[in-house]
Amino acid sequence: MSRSYDSRTTIFSPEGRLYQVEYALEAINHAGVALGIVAKDGIVLAAEKKVTSKLLEQEESAEKLYHIGDNMLCAVAGLTADANILINYARRVGQQYLQTFNEEMPCEQLVRRVCDLKQGYTQYGGLRPFGVSFLYAGWDHIRGYQLFQSNPSGNYGSWQANSIGGNSTSVQSLMRQEYKDDINLDEASAMAVKFLSKTLDSNSLTHEKIEFATITKDTTKNKMVCKIWKSDEINEVLNKYQETQRQS
């Protein structure tokens, strides 16, 4: 019976479900995992980089982590093409706010604007939901460091630590057991490596398999630093984690 409700985005099933939104969520469950952890001095984003073929040329640029503005980064899980559209939209909205008010847009206000667009694609005929979830990491003078998660329905929430994509349930279970409010950025980075190593189907992590990004505040210049890590920086944190594992 439910098949007659599948093709139309805007029609609820008798059980009150929107199947197209559920299918979009299912696409995210087949994507690589991405996670975010808030520390007292910054935020860590980490993501699995899936290598589909040995013949594929490896790029230095990240494919799951993106800059949105000077005070905000994001991680994505799902359809990358859909993510690119929403990221470009978020960048335009942020730049328009910056030009108008001469300051960076508050994080939650920007997340809400993007989620309003995503929600519209679940409500109008002839459209389909965006098949991508986001983790937004940012800072503003109102609430400090913030981590938001959003899904194709347009819902969003604020978190201290969360994950999206495949194996996200396992990562969230580990987060509930091990996350603490007073960790610093180095501890959060080590925790992110630990969570990825326990959930990915791999004997050893390398910079080719994961991506890292951090957002911190440079107190000397009084500005935010949103940084997507290079290969040697990722290897450094991986080596530290492996050394800790050997000693334990």
Swiss-Prot record:
InterPro entries: Ntn_hydrolases_N (IPR029055), Proteasome_alpha (IPR050115), Proteasome_alpha-type (IPR023332), Proteasome_asu_N (IPR000426), Proteasome_bsu_CS (IPR016050), Proteasome_sua/b (IPR001353). GO terms for cellular component: cytosol; nucleus; proteasome core complex, alpha-subunit complex. Keywords: Cytoplasm, Nucleus, Proteasome. One of its GO terms (biological process) is proteasome-mediated ubiquitin-dependent protein catabolic process. Its main location: cytoplasm. Disulfide bonds: none annotated. It is found in: Cytoplasm; Nucleus. The proteasome is a multicatalytic proteinase complex which is characterized by its ability to cleave peptides with Arg, Phe, Tyr, Leu, and Glu adjacent to the leaving group at neutral or slightly basic pH. The proteasome has an ATP-dependent proteolytic activity. NCBIfam families: PRK03996.1. The 26S proteasome consists of a 20S proteasome core and two 19S regulatory subunits. The 20S proteasome core is composed of 28 subunits that are arranged in four stacked rings, resulting in a barrel-shaped structure. The two end rings are each formed by seven alpha subunits, and the two central rings are each formed by seven beta subunits. The catalytic chamber with the active sites is on the inside of the barrel. PANTHER family: PROTEASOME SUBUNIT ALPHA/BETA. Belongs to the peptidase T1A family. This is Probable proteasome subunit alpha type-3. It comes from Schizosaccharomyces pombe (strain 972 / ATCC 24843) (Fission yeast).
